[in-house]
């Protein structure tokens, strides 16, 4: 343009394609396998329990590590919820406690904190051991628990994307849609297939 060879910028209307993130999470079979394995070492059992707890709450490591009894409240529905502030954004959030998460809290309720205290580095190191013992061929990190909560626990059980977005603490639903686009598409495909079979009858 500056040299006078062309009048308009040919890239002005060009919009790059969005890159769909590939997310790693545990399938329902892998999660079941993890939940039911008997560990001989207490440290691995504790980290497994903490990981599973996050699979059913979606808590990031920062929130999990400071969770105390004051964060557990009985709400309008008579059920227990986690009520606290995100360390990253300082936004308040609430997550209803599913039965499996409650059972893990009850297991460790004698502790000063609701869950054992393990550093983030050791946590991920122990997860690597756990994956090798159980035979999960994925690089297990704490972050995968949050992804598992969003996908295997919520989306694959037909929880609406709006609710998933709220429970993950996303400020915009578009953030959730971008992160979990492939999962949502797969669910839409499954539901349309089910609808097609019903309409064919």
Set out the residue ranges of the language-model regions:
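Amphipathic, well-packed alpha-helical segments that form the structural scaffold of globular domains
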Residues: 15, 35-39, 65, 102, ...
């Amino acid at each position: 343009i500056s040299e006078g060879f062309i009048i308009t910028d040919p890239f002005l209307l060009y919009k790059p394609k969005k890159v769909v993130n590939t997310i790693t999470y545990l399938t329902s079979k892998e999660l079941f396998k993890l939940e039911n394995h008997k560990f001989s070492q207490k440290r691995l059992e504790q980290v497994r329990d903490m990981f599973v707890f996050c699979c059913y709450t979606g808590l990031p490591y920062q929130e999990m590590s400071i969770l105390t009894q004051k964060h557990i409240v009985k709400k309008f529905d008579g059920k227990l919820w986690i009520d606290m502030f995100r360390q990253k954004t300082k936004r308040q959030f609430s997550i209803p406690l599913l039965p499996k998460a409650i059972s893990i809290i009850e297991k460790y309720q004698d502790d000063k904190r609701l869950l054992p205290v393990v550093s983030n580095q050791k946590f991920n190191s122990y997860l690597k051991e756990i994956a090798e013992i159980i035979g999960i061929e994925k690089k297990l990190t704490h972050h995968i628990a949050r992804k598992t909560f969003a996908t295997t626990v919520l989306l694959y059980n037909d929880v609406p994307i709006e609710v998933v977005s709220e429970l993950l603490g996303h400020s915009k639903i578009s953030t959730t849609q971008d992160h979990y686009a492939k999962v949502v598409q797969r669910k839409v495909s499954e539901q349309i297939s089910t609808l097609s079979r019903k309409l064919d009858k």
